[in-house]
Regions:
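Zymogen propeptides/activation segments of proteases
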Residues: 2-7, 22-406, 413-576
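Sec-dependent signal peptide hydrophobic core
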Residues: 5-16
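Cellulosome-associated attachment modules in secreted, modular CAZymes
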Residues: 8, 19, 23-30, 575-641
Length: 641
């Protein structure tokens, strides 16, 4: 992942800083006064390389008054524009492309028509998001996107994310043929059927670009494989949705003999329930046609996930519509039931049908084995497929038994479709896991803020709202951003606790569940797409932005303060809102201590945002306890709050 620091200031504060920096004695007759755009560019560390770039920035300043914020990386690339992008509404993808054209000089794009092509148009409750891909000499650059976010109600383009790569060059002549690449794929994936290919430029970070063959297969779970077109190394295998033939004949299936209480796989003591199956000829198929959910099983009942890919022919079937004669049939029914619940959660809360919002076919594998043909203790998302291990059988039951585990894996498929984070490491990888945990917790609807409690048999039958001693991940345990800087080495799951603990604090601060989950889902509209792009700072900004979108009443400012307080709790700060920094100078010292003491004594009033910064122990109060904490910090007695 490219190491860089994003620099972002509001228009008002940046121009004030620039004015202070630029106020120097001028010789008599000098008239070369910096323009407003030049002042703003200087304040955020942006070098304007042309008059056209200056004009583009000037136009943005003119139409935004005080609402503009621009982010720039260390390579002088504009990565984000938060503010009104045009005075004209956006009603089509062509309009969105025109927005990019108007800012192309800032983004470093030489030829918009040649280098940028529409990839996707998606909608949430509040926004319409136009996603464009970058091309180089006619070849797609994988993981390089520009997104334009448009308010659905007003039609205003109000946000832009860019991972466009400028000043780029690579040899586009492959050293191996596509047939050689096909052979590599066939050797690894046991002769799966190949249905297409193209030549692309592949990158997982902004410093390592490779010419690659993208091989498309018709397998479920491995539908795109990237093969280095020079070395023949497999760079990545990835899943995208492919259209499959429709299935008809829907009927209701009810099974009261699923599992006994001692080996409970479903919550709330539910043992009789409905799932949808379909019938063709004399066979019944475990597939929910309306939701496009298909239960597939390994026909050998013994293979590990890494050694086979399911096809539609692997759908679980029965002659008598009694899917209860074996463990795998019972697991299949339970998986379909629980995934149906998660599907309905995303649909009812966000209008998001299926993993991709388009109700595309989704495959569920309930009987994955370990690499040693033993019982697998894990679960995976593979884009258009979910895979569940059966658990070790002694202390664990199926990993499909816990609704938040299914919500987690389903969430991976959703974020994979919306922001393409799959396979990322570092902070993006941590975000990928955090969002999955957050969605899983809200699907569970218990607010215990623990993932995977129900897979453990010792927790069976216990009150689901009480905290358990055994779980996969405990989101109530605080992890501070400033305590770990290398998020690659500590791993995605451990790093994810920074952001998932933020969600826990949003809940503790009183943001109700139906509002909070909409905030998190809507925040995906504002986050950078592609592998290894998004950071924790991006997440804070996106969640604050989403809060302003979701909460449209008088309580908006109160909710924004709560969200910022939750991020402060894990030390993911705004530049101007560091906890305890009441002087707003980016550091904690005796000057902040003086202001805090005055506030506690009642001789100085604080705004709601300042009160959130002054509440160092996060107890909802500003009192002597906060003074003691800050004093000990200033004296060097403690290093954290």
């Amino acid at each position: 992942m490219k190491s860089y620091t994003k620099k972002m200031l509001s228009l008002t504060s940046s121009l004030l800083i620039a004015a202070q920096q630029c106020f120097v004695a001028m010789p008599a007759g000098a008239v070369d006064t910096p323009s407003e755009a030049e002042n703003y560019a200087q304040s955020i560390g942006l070098e304007l390389n042309s008059s056209a770039a200056e004009d583009a920035l000037s136009d943005l300043i003119d139409i935004n008054d005080e609402g503009l914020a621009v982010a720039v990386d260390d390579n002088n690339n504009v990565t984000q524009i938060d503010g009104l992008l045009s005075n004209e509404t956006v009603d089509s993808s062509n309009d969105a492309k025109d927005i990019i054209a108007k800012t192309s000089e800032l983004l470093g794009i030489d030829n918009v028509n040649r280098e940028i092509r529409l990839d996707d148009v998606s909608e949430s409750d509040y926004n319409k998001v136009y996603t464009f891909k970058q091309f180089y000499q006619g070849l797609e650059m994988v993981n390089s996107y520009i997104t334009v976010v448009v308010d659905k109600e007003t039609g205003e383009a109000e946000f832009l994310n860019s991972s466009y790569v400028s000043d780029f060059s690579i040899n586009t002549t492959p050293a191996i043929s596509v047939q050689q690449a096909n052979n590599v794929v066939n050797e690894k994936f046991n002769n799966i059927s190949i249905i297409g290919y193209d030549l692309v430029i592949y990158s997982e970070n902004d410093n390592d670009f490779k010419l690659a063959w993208r091989i498309k297969t018709d397998a479920i779970g491995v539908t795109e494989v990237y093969v280095d077109a020079v070395t023949s190394e497999i760079l990545k295998d990835i899943v995208v949705d492919e259209a499959l033939s429709p299935v008809y004949n829907n009927r209701i299936y009810s099974n009261s003999l699923l599992l006994n209480y001692s080996d409970k796989i479903l919550p709330d003591n539910v043992y009789s329930f409905d799932v949808d199956v379909s019938k063709e000829g004399s066979l019944y198929y475990l597939r929910d046609i309306g939701r496009n959910l298909y239960v597939c099983v390994d026909p050998s009942y013994s293979r590990a996930k890494s050694s086979w890919a399911p096809y539609e022919s692997h759908i679980l079937k029965s002659y008598n519509n009694q899917f209860n004669s074996s463990e795998v049939e019972q697991l299949g029914v339970a998986v379909l039931y629980n995934v149906k619940r998660v599907y309905d959660f995303f649909n009812s809360n966000f209008g998001h049908k299926g993993f991709d919002g388009k109700n595309s076919k989704f495959y569920l594998v309930p009987n994955v084995k370990s690499t040693t043909n033993g019982r697998e203790s894990n679960a995976w998302s593979a884009g258009n497929a979910l895979w569940f291990g059966e658990g070790n059988g002694a202390t664990e039951q199926s990993f499909a038994s816990d609704i938040d585990v299914i919500g987690h894996e389903f969430g991976h498929s959703v974020t994979g479709s919306k922001v393409q984070w799959g396979g990322s490491n570092g902070q993006t990888g941590a975000l990928n896991e955090a969002y999955a945990d957050i969605f899983g917790e809200y699907c569970d609807n218990t607010r215990e803020w623990q993932i995977g409690t129900d897979i453990y048999k010792k927790n069976t039958g216990k009150n689901t709202t009480n905290k358990k001693t055994t779980c996969i991940r405990d989101l109530t345990i605080r992890k501070n951003h400033n305590k770990s800087t290398n998020y690659v080495s500590i791993g995605n799951h451990e790093g994810s606790k920074v952001i998932s603990h933020t969600a826990y604090w949003m809940d503790k601060l009183g943001i109700e569940a139906n509002t909070a989950v909409k905030i998190w889902f809507t925040s995906l509209d504002y986050l950078p797409k592609g592998g290894n792009k998004a950071t924790f700072d991006d997440c804070r900004k996106a969640v604050v932005r989403a809060t302003q979108k979701v909460v449209q009443n008088k309580a908006q400012s109160e909710y924004v303060v709560k969200v910022k307080t939750a991020f402060n709790r894990v030390h993911v700060y705004d530049n101007n809102e560091i906890i305890g920094d009441l002087c707003h100078d980016g550091k904690l010292d005796s000057f902040d201590l003086v202001i805090l003491k005055q506030a506690v004594m009642g001789t100085k009033s604080l705004t709601p945002a300042e009160r959130a910064q002054a509440d160092l122990n996060f107890d909802g109060k500003v009192n002597s306890a906060d003074v003691t904490l800050l004093q000990n910090y200033v004296l060097g007695k403690i290093t954290d709050f």
